Amino acid sequence: MGEFKVHRVRFFNYVPSGIRCVAYNNQSNRLAVSRTDGTVEIYNLSANYFQEKFFPGHESRATEALCWAEGQRLFSAGLNGEIMEYDLQALNIKYAMDAFGGPIWSMAASPSGSQLLVGCEDGSVKLFQITPDKIQFERNFDRQKSRILSLSWHPSGTHIAAGSIDYISVFDVKSGSAVHKMIVDRQYMGVSKRKCIVWGVAFLSDGTIISVDSAGKVQFWDSATGTLVKSHLIANADVQSIAVADQEDSFVVGTAEGTVFHFQLVPVTSNSSEKQWVRTKPFQHHTHDVRTVAHSPTALISGGTDTHLVFRPLMEKVEVKNYDAALRKITFPHRCLISCSKKRQLLLFQFAHHLELWRLGSTVATGKNGDTLPLSKNADHLLHLKTKGPENIICSCISPCGSWIAYSTVSRFFLYRLNYEHDNISLKRVSKMPAFLRSALQILFSEDSTKLFVASNQGALHIVQLSGGSFKHLHAFQPQSGTVEAMCLLAVSPDGNWLAASGTSAGVHVYNVKQLKLHCTVPAYNFPVTAMAIAPNTNNLVIAHSDQQVFEYSIPDKQYTDWSRTVQKQGFHHLWLQRDTPITHISFHPKRPMHILLHDAYMFCIIDKSLPLPNDKTLLYNPFPPTNESDVIRRRTAHAFKISKIYKPLLFMDLLDERTLVAVERPLDDIIAQLPPPIKKKKFGT
């Protein structure tokens, strides 16, 4: 692997927002996740659980409900009283409609997907018809005395259940009238509570309604008679969420204590046809409230205040050992929040509402391999750039020379010129940005910092010439297919001649920057692109996909390289393919053209294309790389993959020069330390 001086950075104080709600789409096997800052993320569970899309948050959009309807249409609602639909191609909000019922606490799509229900602060339940372009208000149901906190349709679509404070209502959909009102027991551990909040309801085909509430109970109701059938006290705190499997043979609930409980419908005796609900498995994968749960055919999904998105596999449902067979926790976004100015040794950190610019520390000390060297000069926090307005930052970038910073929100694009005088820094905003640069999904500077490449949310790729403190728009590449396809990843060649762009359809287009035309399109692949980069000298495009495959494509020759064909013929090591975090960054060594540097959240890897590929019998994570020419045994076992797991969780890693690396880590304990305290539990013997 070689020896590097490594800047080990741990001052990126990034804390993901907590998870508020999730919605699973069985047709597409995708999961929508809403966070407390209003951000909505889309995970493709068929593509190794990759976060393929996201919609940036907004301070006034506290999302309380999320659901899929009409197959691939995604809706959300929140405390601002609006219902929103998302454009999954252009990655923006199609429209927002006021429901005129105050804050919205719950939402559910009908079994047919053609209707949408919302539960409001004023006690109203509103029914909307889903039309091809929008949603249309149909009618109100009988208004209740308190806010509607949870909703569930009967699978036939004829009735709905609505959870409120102290009671559950059953409505007839055709008439909109309440046919039953079931009072929830306020008793908690023998003491009568002031209020009992019904956080979740689930309406089953046989007419059973399952409710979860703030008294720590899971209760079963007969909707035909409006009576309580059975009650389970499972927690000393709120049971906040519930999700039922499509087959209605199991369901999952989440509690404020961080525990997830699995219930299954099992026969009363081995030969009996009669079945009953039994609590079978408790799981403790969270430290804080489990605010939301989902149930896929093969896993229990949960999320909450501790920011983790947890997939717990149901091993009896997993047929073969694959991506679905592993417990996984997703904490960090599958995109890069850090950019680097190698020339000035600067790091730009992206947060939701501000940017931070840091200069790396330095040392004059020397030592042997593995030593930690004392700093002669500490890292400097040079700049804190706060956004104006309620919108989250979508993307940001600092130029390689360190003289430009660009970032974008949903409605505005910002470009700044930086000037350095000794230890002082001055910032000047470039004014009068053109209207077509209103918003960007991805930003990238050329290696010489003279050009800025901007992927707009309308599918166009803009090239901007930078000179002094001004800019000039050179060209715009329009979407190839005629439809708006958001470009999520950009890569530019070091010589500035080639620009690669990857869109939401997993295709990669390569443009000739000098001739301002499309050069070629990389052959389509079934899995999304997670990272890509263009190598110096050869102009080979290296592409990493969510299934852990890595391809090398020759841009001048418009074909895969011989090395890439060899890799696809022989195949990657099975341990490499079983990794559950995507590659998020690729770079190259300036003096070693055969080396590819890449990393995910838990490993840093150098691929040496001059060495043979490891087979499945070879030790992939080889702890003994060759140290000198006489080390014959080690050289015989050497293979192309040199992997280090020292740095983790690893959010960014890149070469500053041929002998220096920078690694940005974010320990999970540091994140948990900044979260609100969890519910205090009494331990035995204390």
Curated annotation (Swiss-Prot):
Protein's cellular compartments: Nucleus, Nucleolus; Chromosome
Upper taxonomic lineage: Eukaryota, Metazoa, Chordata, Craniata, Vertebrata
Gene3D superfamilies, per database record: YVTN repeat-like/Quinoprotein amine dehydrogenase
Pfam family, one: WD40
Organism: Homo sapiens
Ranges for the WD repeats: 7-50, 51-92, 93-135, 136-181, 182-226, 227-275, 276-317, 318-377, 378-427, 428-475, 476-516, 517-566, 567-627, 628-666
Residues in cross-link Glycyl lysine isopeptide (Lys-Gly) (interchain with G-Cter in SUMO2): K321
GO molecular function: RNA binding
Superkingdom: Eukaryota
Keyword check for Repeat: yes
GO CC terms of this entry: 90S preribosome; chromosome; fibrillar center; nucleolus; nucleoplasm; small-subunit processome; t-UTP complex
Protein function: Ribosome biogenesis factor. Involved in nucleolar processing of pre-18S ribosomal RNA. Part of the small subunit (SSU) processome, first precursor of the small eukaryotic ribosomal subunit. During the assembly of the SSU processome in the nucleolus, many ribosome biogenesis factors, an RNA chaperone and ribosomal proteins associate with the nascent pre-rRNA and work in concert to generate RNA folding, modifications, rearrangements and cleavage as well as targeted d Involved in SSU pre-rRNA processing at sites A', A0, 1 and 2b. (Microbial infection) Acts as a positive regulator of HIVEP1 which specifically binds to the DNA sequence 5'-GGGACTTTCC-3' found in enhancer elements of numerous viral promoters such as those of HIV-1, SV40, or CMV.
Record protein name field: U3 small nucleolar RNA-associated protein 4 homolog
Post-translational note: May be phosphorylated during mitosis; may control the association of this protein with WRD43 and UTP15.
UniProt keyword Transcription regulation, yes or no: yes
Subunit field text: Interacts with HIVEP1 Interacts with NOL11. Part of the small subunit (SSU) processome, composed of more than 70 proteins and the RNA chaperone small nucleolar RNA (snoRNA) U3. May be a component of the proposed t-UTP subcomplex of the ribosomal small subunit (SSU) processome containing at least UTP4, WDR43, HEATR1, UTP15, WDR75.
UniProt keyword list: Chromosome, Isopeptide bond, Nucleus, Phosphoprotein, Repeat, Ribosome biogenesis, rRNA processing, Transcription, Transcription regulation, Ubl conjugation, WD repeat
SMART domains linked to this entry: WD40
